[in-house]
């Protein structure tokens, strides 16, 4: 009887460990690689002005965006806010936490950066979807 009580007590004290979401898993992979100088093409998939959609060529040095389309980066300019890979992975995680009705999540298996991401947050609302595409990734 003591053993049964100990087993039940032990099992009740255990917590269920939730698996990491894909964005967190890939952010961890990205961080393991310690990449701080890189470039990539970034495209938003949305019903947005073409200047906002892109594609935009982004250059990151020492973990900060330095240029967008060959010009010094300024978030207030017509392209809107651009993201480094870790920032984009945080945006993706925040969107996963919103529990979209549909999502497509594809990541580079070597480095963990997102390649194709898409979220639809409501089947009943048109044009609220958002997606991101990263191509031409290169470590500098």
Residues covered by each model-derived region:
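Sec-dependent signal peptide recognition
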Residues: 1-7
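Short hydrophobic/aromatic-rich beta-strand segments that constitute the beta-sheet cores
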Residues: 40-42, 65-70, 116
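A short, Trp-centered hydrophobic/proline-enriched beta-strand micro-motif
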Residues: 33-44
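Short, surface-exposed coil-to-beta transition loops
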Residues: 50-55, 100, 127-130
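Short, exposed beta-strand-loop hairpins at the edges of beta-sheets
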Residues: 114-132
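Mature extracytoplasmic domains of secretory-pathway proteins
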Residues: 59-103
């Amino acid at each position: 009887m003591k053993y049964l009580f100990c087993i039940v007590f032990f099992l009740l004290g255990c917590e269920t460990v939730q698996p990491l979401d894909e964005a967190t898993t890939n952010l961890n992979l990205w961080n393991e690689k310690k990449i701080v100088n890189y470039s990539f093409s970034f495209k938003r998939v949305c019903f947005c002005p073409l200047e906002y959609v892109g594609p935009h060529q982004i250059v990151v040095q020492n973990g900060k965006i330095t240029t967008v389309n060959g010009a010094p980066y300024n978030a207030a300019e017509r392209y809107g806010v651009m993201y480094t890979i870790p920032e984009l992975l945080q945006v993706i995680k925040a969107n996963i936490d919103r529990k979209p009705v549909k999502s497509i999540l594809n990541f580079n298996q070597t480095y963990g950066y997102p390649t194709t991401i898409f979220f639809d947050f409501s089947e009943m609302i048109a044009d609220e979807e958002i997606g991101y595409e990263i191509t031409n990734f290169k470590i500098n």
